[in-house]
């Protein structure tokens, strides 16, 4: 089966890593399908694909909606699934209510696993496939003020590690992508979260985070770097279990492994004024 016959579905594909991935897998000869949540986002994807000179189909897909997931996966029967949909889920544990936490876990844990469950029988029947889960360097460590986001990525890491072994004999590779900071609309969303927490005990710390994001945005990587890796994973005979992407991800990984927990805690408190 050639790449041109293989369908790859990318969720959360209207911007950032998702959009870059949908375009790049199309460029590599796969049938690329972008999952989006609104007609406006579908039009945005169509414009970007046209500008890139590739064909990307869009489907309406809310990964937290079981009916949506079943409909799309039954129709597409994809060779490749890229679970990229996400929400910022920022805020101190004390500030994040049940509904925000639920949305984070449904979007970034339950949704990806639901899609994977639906994809596996089709992939098994086709003789193999690829499930690529977009985690984060913060799926390997934890910092203050984004605990629920990081909890979702830690959960995604654990579930991916279990699933990888469970379905390896079926020729289905489960791959974790662990990026650092790459340009995406999610950073703007995180900034908006700060404005919603004006009365928080942690507002001064949120301001420091917001200022840090603004200062670092020009240093953030181009999402095409991640997209090219994902496209290569789709074509690889034996992809690795996980890939760190970005100089900052590699640096943070070393930092997390070398420094004792107490030292990391102290540095975080000093940096954020906690």
Task: List where the protein language model places each region.
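C-terminal beta-strand-loop-alpha-helix "lid" module of Rossmann-like NAD(P)-dependent dehydrogenases
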Residues: 169-217
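Conserved glycine-rich cofactor-binding loop
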Residues: 14-15
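The beta1-alpha1 cofactor-binding region of Rossmann-like NAD(H)/NADP(H)-dependent oxidoreductases
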Residues: 60-71, 98-99
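Residue(s) in the substrate-gating loop at a strand-loop-helix junction
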Residues: 136
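Active-site helix of classical SDR
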Residues: 116, 152
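Conserved glycine-rich Rossmann-like NAD(P)H-binding loop of the short-chain dehydrogenase/reductase
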Residues: 28-44
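Substrate-binding pocket helix/loop in short-chain dehydrogenase/reductase
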Residues: 92-93, 100-102
